[in-house]
Amino acid sequence: MKDESVLNVLMYLFKNHMQENCTLDLGEKKLLVQLEELGFHRTVIDQALSWLNNLSYSAREPMQLPQKNSFRVFSDYECDLLDTECRRFLITLEQQAILNPHTRELVINQALELSCEGIDVSLLKWVTLMVLFNQSSEKEALASMELLVLDDTVGGIH
């Protein structure tokens, strides 16, 4: 039985389907059957696929970007869910040009959707990787993030 986690489903999909194919048909019955055969429960699979759908939709939505000389202030709600280490990690990714204001906001929004999983830096790394994967204009940032995430999970998910 797989660990009942939306993140585990997302990690499996990324490592076994998205990296190879660059696309993923979320409605494909074969995919649902495969995930269930691996031991994932249908409710967790549905949550993961819904999360991916939301990411795909959010990534296409126009977003008003902040001024170049502005800085991000986290709300009390965000601070409750994203500890200091998580916020520092996001700021570091932006300073290293892995994230820009648009992708940073996507990462925060998508991470907050997984708040029941318990948000930590490990989860943020995977969320960031999947957000960048869905941004066709962010190939260089994606490559940097892949190195950061996949190096941390040697022997992780098969």
Curated annotation (Swiss-Prot):
Q: Which domain of life is it from?
A: Bacteria
- Per the database entry, which stretches of residues form a coiled coil? none
- One Pfam family, short name please? DUF494
Write down the HAMAP family for this protein, in alphabetical order. Answer: Smg
Give the similarity note.
Belongs to the Smg family.
Task: Quote the protein name from its UniProt record.
Answer: Protein Smg homolog
Question: What species is this protein from?
Answer: Coxiella burnetii (strain Dugway 5J108-111)
